[in-house]
């Protein structure tokens, strides 16, 4: 019995001694930490948010892909079916500072051959930089989308199933400069000057008659208004301008887009018009065989969208288009609808 009591006493004494050693080590470690804190240099003063540069503001990269399975049946021809990659675009954009911004967008399924006038590939949609002069004025320069107006024109190509003939035949990514004035958050006015085309005159029109010569300043001048009215109930994308296509030949374009914007229902109506002294859109019946003058184009596009739930969008779109000039039988009427 005495041996058992002696063993228990020795065990308790050993535990107490070990606890004391551990406590001494903890106290010594705390003292060393306090000493390091006392001798460490004071942190540098930095104003609130100073030096904070979120990467998502400087650099954003996107890959956009749109594909389809197309089943087509032309009159008096067999039905065809195919998978088709409509869009494959790589985009980088961001704000370098609060004032300086940039954007680059390139199509990966289009030719990289350089154009003969602006020396850039048509696959490059956008390559521009901008500078915010203040909270109302902005300057932008580089290759950009022309600011014609219209909601179909303004939509992301990823959300387009089929363009109208008017937009399908336009070249609207041009090298140039733009000044923007936004008096408030509901209105924006743009004045833009760009090249009239990507390629030289002869590459588009070929050998022309001696009475037609290339413009000395082949430029496009566009004025555009983007507006939100009645607490964003009505939206506008209106634009118009002049294209100096050749010496003495000017083309006038007008594109008016108006949209009714309700919480679950939206509908827009676009009217697009081109009076071309020298045919540039080139989709009258004779445009592919002769040099057409005084061509007139009109396009009407109506699109309605409904979202019964946030994850579902139901749409229907209709269009009516005309193209003509004074040549005999040189008139086209087109109609279409999508849903």
Q: What does each of the following model-derived ranges do?
A:
Residues 218, 223-337:
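Detector for outer-membrane/organellar transmembrane beta-barrel domains
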Residues 68-76, 107-115, 144-150, 160-163, ...:
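Sequence/structural signature of outer-membrane beta-barrel proteins
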Residues 77-82, 110-119, 169-174, 213-217, ...:
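Solvent-exposed loop/turn segments connecting transmembrane beta-strands
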Residues 63-65, 104, 141, 179, ...:
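Membrane-embedded beta-strand positions of outer-membrane beta-barrel proteins
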Residues 9-17:
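Hydrophobic h-region of N-terminal signal peptides that target proteins for export
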Residues 50-73, 77-199, 226-232:
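Outer membrane beta-barrel
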Residues 1-4:
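Positively charged n-region of N-terminal signal peptides that target proteins for export
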Residues 18-66:
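N-terminal periplasmic/intermembrane-space "pro-region" immediately following the signal or transit peptide
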């Amino acid at each position: 019995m005495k041996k058992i009591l002696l063993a228990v006493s020795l065990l308790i004494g050993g535990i107490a001694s070990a606890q004391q050693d551990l406590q001494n080590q903890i106290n010594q470690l705390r003292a060393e930490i306090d000493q390091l804190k006392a001798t460490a240099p004071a942190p540098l003063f930095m104003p609130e948010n100073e030096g904070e540069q979120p990467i998502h503001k400087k650099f954003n990269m996107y890959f956009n892909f749109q594909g389809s399975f197309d089943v087509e049946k032309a009159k008096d021809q067999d039905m065809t079916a195919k998978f088709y990659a409509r869009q494959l675009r790589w985009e980088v954009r961001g704000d370098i500072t609060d004032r300086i911004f940039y954007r680059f967008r390139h199509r990966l399924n289009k030719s990289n051959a350089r154009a003969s006038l602006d020396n850039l590939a048509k696959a490059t949609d956008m390559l521009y930089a901008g500078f915010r002069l203040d909270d109302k004025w902005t300057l932008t320069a580089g290759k950009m989308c022309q600011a014609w107006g219209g909601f179909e024109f303004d939509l992301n190509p990823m959300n387009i199933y089929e363009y109208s003939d008017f937009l399908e035949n336009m070249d609207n990514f041009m090298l140039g400069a733009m000044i923007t004035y936004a008096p408030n958050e509901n209105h924006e006015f743009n004045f833009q000057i760009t090249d009239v085309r990507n390629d030289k005159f002869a590459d588009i029109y070929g050998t022309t008659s001696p009475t037609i010569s290339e413009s000395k300043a082949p430029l496009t001048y566009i004025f555009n208004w983007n507006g939100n009215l009645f607490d964003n109930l009505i939206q506008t994308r209106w634009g118009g301008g002049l294209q100096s296509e050749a010496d003495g030949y000017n083309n006038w374009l007008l594109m008016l887009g108006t949209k009714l914007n309700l919480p679950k229902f939206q509908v827009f109506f676009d009217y697009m018009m081109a009076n071309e002294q020298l045919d540039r859109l080139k989709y009258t019946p004779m445009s592919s065989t002769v040099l057409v003058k005084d061509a007139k184009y009109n396009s009407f596009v109506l699109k309605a969208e409904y979202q019964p739930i946030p994850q579902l969008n139901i749409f229907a779109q209709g269009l009516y288009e005309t193209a003509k000039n004074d040549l005999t039988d040189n008139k086209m009427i087109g109609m279409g609808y999508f849903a």
